Amino acid sequence: MNGAKQAPEISVNRAGRQARIVAILSTESVSSQSELAALLAVQGIEATQATLSRDLEELGAVKLRGADGGVGVYVVPEDGSPVRGVTGGTGRLARLLGELLVSSDASANLAVLRTPPGGAHYLASAIDRAALPYVVGTIAGDDTVFVAAREPMTGAELAIALEKLK
């Protein structure tokens, strides 16, 4: 035996497995799918890398690095749900803006938000989920989020509004 205690394998459906993944990612710093598979195995849940990859995508999990560029860890949106306008979305958005927003700029109807490397998708998802009435939508790269303002708001006004939320 390799020393790691492993529970007997149990049969868990997709929803149960994903609930365990959310629980693990909310309490552990997991930097790889193989590490996640090992943590699930300890609980008696066997999952292939392909299955974990699909689960992480469905949960909206992203790998986030700190501003220092250290090792990335998986994070899942607090509610684990891919739906817009979840309860508490603006409170969560305010917290994430405080943690991730490095700077903001604007052009025409776009607010351009800068994050640490790897943070843009997570911030864009939070903006989308908050369902702000003055936001049409977001596009995220690695460290940049374009946020489209709903007319008559300008990108500069939107950038200021988002800065005030943090």
From Swiss-Prot:
Domain of life (superkingdom): Bacteria
Cell location: Cytoplasm
Similarity annotation: Belongs to the ArgR family.
Gene3D superfamilies given in the database record: 3.30.1360.40, Winged helix-like DNA-binding domain superfamily/Winged helix DNA-binding domain
Record keyword Amino-acid biosynthesis present: yes
Protein's job: Regulates arginine biosynthesis genes.
Organism the protein comes from: Mycobacterium marinum (strain ATCC BAA-535 / M)
Predominant subcellular localization, coarse grouping: cytoplasm
GO molecular function: arginine binding; DNA binding; DNA-binding transcription factor activity
Keyword tags: Amino-acid biosynthesis, Arginine biosynthesis, Cytoplasm, DNA-binding, Repressor, Transcription, Transcription regulation
Protein name per UniProt: Arginine repressor
